[in-house]
């Protein structure tokens, strides 16, 4: 039986919020420096998984009750090595309902993923990717692929593409299971996710505060 390798939650935007987003800040009692700009669920790529409520903060000033709160180093640097400011994204109260859902597992392949040529497989009991509407509990039709724009096997991003519009203000859960590498071995799951999945105590405050 496949065990879940990754799972995260995200919220679709209803409209523009204020510009009062609060960022995660490390406690004065933290024993080590914590990079709150990055989600430890996907430690190999800062900013992933995306979109995610990890990169949001509660807000009384928005329709959704949340506001995007990307850190100054969350967005990857451009080709010139310059960071992109998240200022304008942080004015939003959720993420675009048209965005693909992306994460990263080193050496992940497309083997067994729901293909764009057979989308009906998203309903299979052993589907490797799940996209669930929290309000209805129903699966959302989608297909998945790995980024083919690079020859570096370890660097390819896993992308999930909904094939129907997601609801404004909707809340969704993504689940991933049984993704394999080029040798057919299950790709490694992050320690942070294993701690969350199995209910274990973590030394990482980014896990403990979830």
Task: Enumerate the predicted regions with their spans.
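Acidic, low-complexity Ser/Thr/Gly/Pro-rich repeat segments typical of extracellular/periplasmic
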Residues: 26-210
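Ser/Thr-rich, Pro/Gly/Ala-heavy low-complexity intrinsically disordered linkers and tails
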Residues: 13-31
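Sec-dependent bacterial lipoprotein signal peptides
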Residues: 1-14
């Amino acid at each position: 039986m496949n065990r879940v390798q990754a799972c995260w939650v995200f919220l679709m935007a209803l409209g523009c919020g204020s510009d009062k987003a609060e960022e995660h800040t490390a406690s004065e009692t933290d024993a080590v420096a914590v990079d709150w700009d990055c989600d430890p669920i996907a430690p190999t790529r800062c900013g992933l998984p995306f979109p995610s409520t990890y990169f949001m903060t509660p807000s009384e000033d928005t329709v959704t009750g949340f506001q995007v709160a990307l850190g100054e180093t969350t967005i990857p640097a451009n080709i010139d090595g310059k960071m992109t400011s998240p200022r304008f994204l942080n004015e939003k109260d959720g993420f675009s309902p048209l965005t693909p859902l992306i994460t990263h597992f080193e050496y992940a392949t497309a083997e067994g993923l729901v293909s764009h040529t057979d989308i009906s497989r998203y309903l299979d009991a052993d589907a490797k990717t799940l996209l669930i509407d929290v309000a209805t509990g129903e699966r959302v039709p989608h297909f998945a692929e790995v980024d083919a724009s690079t020859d570096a096997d370890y660097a390819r991003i896993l992308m999930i593409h909904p094939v129907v519009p997601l609801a404004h203000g909707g809340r969704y859960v993504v689940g991933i299971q049984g993704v394999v590498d080029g040798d057919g071995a299950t790709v490694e799951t992050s320690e942070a996710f294993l701690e969350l999945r199995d209910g274990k105590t973590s030394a990482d405050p980014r896990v403990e505060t979830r």
